[in-house]
Design a protein with these regions (language model features):
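Structural motif
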Residues: 17, 91-93, 141-142
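Generic structural signal for beta-strand residues in well-ordered domains
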Residues: 9-11, 39, 133
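Glycine-rich anion-binding surface patch
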Residues: 22, 70, 122-123, 145, ...
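Interfaces that engage single-stranded nucleic acids at replication/repair/recombination sites
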Residues: 1-20, 24-26, 35, 45, ...
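Phosphate-binding/switch region of NTP-binding enzymes
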Residues: 21, 127, 131-215
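Conserved inter-motif catalytic segment of the P-loop NTP-binding fold
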Residues: 21, 40-131
Length: 246
């Protein structure tokens, strides 16, 4: 039976995507965001599909790592997220979800018969993975690789080719599933391409530090007695040290 009720704001769990080309600092930036949200490295887990890259930043703190071991099927990702949830992780970093889409494209390419009809064997698996992310009781940060191209920029009177990120390597429209999508470039500058929190859209580019994660957590925990704490709008949040490449 249908009913109508007043709108209410419940405590939210952020579903955030960080997208950029190789070397833009996605893993490192995700860890800084996660620490800003928890202030406790032991409550952070990284689901690693990047051949051990999650361990490169162990000097930051003792966070947890789940290696996918070369199995990038949606079912293995789902199992890894469930493992982290059962272990009481507050923030789960899925690094990256592009490998899952690559796996599904390869799976589809190997199917016999009508190519269009064969998507019926792929889409439910992708949808189950997306729903696992959206319905998780933990904060989820997903990284996505972007396709790369080169543009010519002028430096000291000369045209120099620079690598730029284009479309994310995931299913079309995947960005619609997230509350926030942050685009990060090779200089580790970040801008929001989607933002339902009101924290980032229309603001200058910035560099991620834990203070960004703190601002996101404040938004998630908003109740009628609280007000949103807007993050700083200068180029950096707190510590201006840029993220290393990852």
């Amino acid at each position: 039976m249908l009913n109508i009720r007043p709108s209410t704001r419940k405590q939210a769990k952020i579903k955030l995507a960080l997208q950029g080309c190789a070397g833009s600092g996605k893993t490192y930036s995700a860890l800084l965001l996660a620490y800003g949200m928890t202030s406790d490295w032991s409550k952070i887990a990284v689901i690693d599909s990047e051949n051990g890259s999650a361990d490169l930043y162990a000097h930051l703190g003792t966070y947890n790592v789940v290696s996918l071991g070369g199995d990038y099927s949606p079912e293995n990702y789902i199992e890894a997220i469930t493992l982290c949830e059962n272990a009481g992780m507050e923030v789960i970093i899925v690094d990256s979800i592009s490998q899952c889409w690559d796996y599904l494209l390869d799976f589809h390419a190997g199917l016999q018969g009508n190519s269009f009809a064969n998507w019926a064997k792929v889409t439910p698996r992708q949808n189950a993975f997306v729903q696992k992310i959206l319905q998780s009781p933990a904060h989820i940060i997903c990284t996505m690789r972007t396709k790369q191209d080169y543009v010519l920029n002028e430096k000291n009177g000369k045209l120099v080719p620079e690598k730029v990120g284009l479309k994310a390597m995931q299913r079309d429209g995947m960005d619609y599933e997230f509350t926030v999508v942050l685009d990060i470039d090779l200089k580790h500058h970040v801008q929001a391409s989607k933002d339902r929190t009101g924290l980032f859209m229309g603001r200058p580019e910035f560099t991620i530090t834990p203070k960004v994660g703190q601002a996101i957590l404040n938004w998630c925990n908003l109740n009628p007695q609280q007000t949103i704490v807007q993050p700083q709008t200068s180029q950096t949040y707190g510590n201006s040290t840029p993220a290393p490449s990852c």
